[in-house]
């Protein structure tokens, strides 16, 4: 850093992280965790130090003081659909032990056995500030009326949240995680989607693309691109700067797409963004998209 400004960096797929450490440190952490955390987790946390897994030990330091209230209040992180906690453990360890930050991390997972397993591991390894809770992404009473699905409520998650993460939240669970982040006005949303099943059955090949989309593989790729493109546009309507990119080599995982949103509080003009979203949906014959429906049912969530 020079003169109080971070140096622009170039990340995966040539992405240039201009003007802020708030973006690129998340990319560095996520890529490293996917590659090198699994051996530690497979060992039950006994034989391998998380700190030895990090190939970019100082990558996050320039952004450590960028959070409001840094040093006065903890950085609050929610991992929705935490599963076995691969990234939850890695991120919490990196921020607390590598960067010395005060962090409160909660992994949210529906399966009680995984919640119990991860809590045992966290306690066994003395990871203060990290816990896992059983529940659904959309909690009863929080989802807009008509879109609740019998979700199990969570305890103690009403406070401000700074970072929302979701790794491979299946299909519309990614939309639910993004909506929760928007609702909680999280500073950063980091989601790696998978499955993309919602739009594919609705997708109608427009006349110019019929010859291309008659192939199943092309139709699937088009549905993925459309799904994540709409999600990014919707984030922009809520005051987020949004990017969609590959964050890690496909040799590590084929599910290597990331949606990254950083809250700026400056939303795109509503009419302009709505026109783009509606035009895309009409072009492909899309009748319903989960995040769009959540936002409309809650009358949008205006940025502040």
Task: Pin down the residues of each PLM region.
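Class I S-adenosyl-L-methionine
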Residues: 3-4, 9, 33, 41, ...
